[in-house]
Every structure is written in structure tokens, then in C-alpha cells.
Amino acid sequence: FLRPLGLRLKEVSSNFGNMDGVNATFTDNQILYNYPIESVFYVYNILTGENKLIESYSAYTQNTVKPLATAVNDYSKWERHGLENPHFYEVMYIPKYKMYMRLHLKETEFDKNKSVAELSDNRELYLTCWNESFQFLCEVMLPGHRYNYYTGWCGLYDGLLLYVNNTTSKDELNDLLKIDVVRPITK
């Protein structure tokens, strides 16, 4: 039997280019969801129906995306808009440590003399971590010119797997599958 959930989904307009979708992660009793356009995220408890806003702000990047002045169907404007604003990815649950992790990209200045791929792969990538109660633990910048920013990661039972494949790193461009796994330091 199906029942509607009390998710408070936003209507995100096309004024945000290709950042108008919702990211969702499912755990045993929760649905975590967020939007690429803002640093905050939401937690819906499947058992109680409670919907909670988690206010989490980056110390290193903008925390909200500025909309395009008008809705446009020009993909090159969407690409530029995407580069000049941060991009917040899904919140992932790491069961072994009962913690949550999220990646996000810092905004960058558009340079018409560089390709979109070069500008994209030169962006700074940040990892933010929270404990099981969604209390902030840390925010760190990951090594530059190392990772694939287009779904080049996944949450694991005991960490975050990142694919080592960035077009700006000549050392990492080959046919071998290379990965890094980020795990918390425990005592």
C-alpha cells in the first residue's frame, strides 16, 4: 500500500540552469534531501513524519546559488552559471561511523579563454561531515586536480570512495581505475 510522505519539496525554477533537481539519500528510517543550490539540507523521519531543516553553512564557499536573471534555454549560459556558483551534492550516510558526509564545489571565476572542462576540473572540492545527530564535525578542502567532479564518488559502509580521474592532472589520466577512500580518524 502506498501513502504520501510529508516531504517539503521546493519548486526550483529553470533560473538555476541544471541545478534544479533534488538530491536524495535513503537510510533505514530517514530520507535526506537537499538541493544543489543551497548548503542547508532536510531530514524526513519515515517513522514519525517529522521533517527537519539542518542549517549547515560552508566557511569557504558561498552558501546559496544566485539565480540567472531570467530563465534561459541557452546551455552555455547554464554552464557559466554553474561555474560561477557553488554546487552542493547529496548527503551520504556512512553506517560504520554513524556519520554523514557531503561534497560540494566552490564557485569559480569564469574565464572565456579557458574551456568549460578546464574551468570545471580546476574547482575546489570540499568535504563536510556531521555526526549521527547532524552536529557539524568538520569541513575540509580535498586535494586539487585529483578527482572527477561528475558523480565520481559513492558512500561506502566505512567511508567515501572518490575516483582519481581529473582532466587537469596529467599523472592521473590513464586506463587504470584508481580510487581514494576517505575515512574518519578514530581513536
Which ranges hold each PLM region?
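Loop-centered beta-sheet repeat module
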Residues: 1-45
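Structural signature of eukaryotic scaffold interfaces centered on beta-propeller domains
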Residues: 14-27, 83-96, 153-157
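Hydrophobic beta-strand positions that form the internal "hydrophobic ladder"
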Residues: 30-32, 100-102, 160-162
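Beta-propeller blade signature
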Residues: 38-49, 116-135, 174-187
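Short glycine/acidic-enriched loop and turn motifs that connect beta-strands
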Residues: 38-40, 107-111, 167-171
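C-terminal structured domain segments
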Residues: 117, 125-168
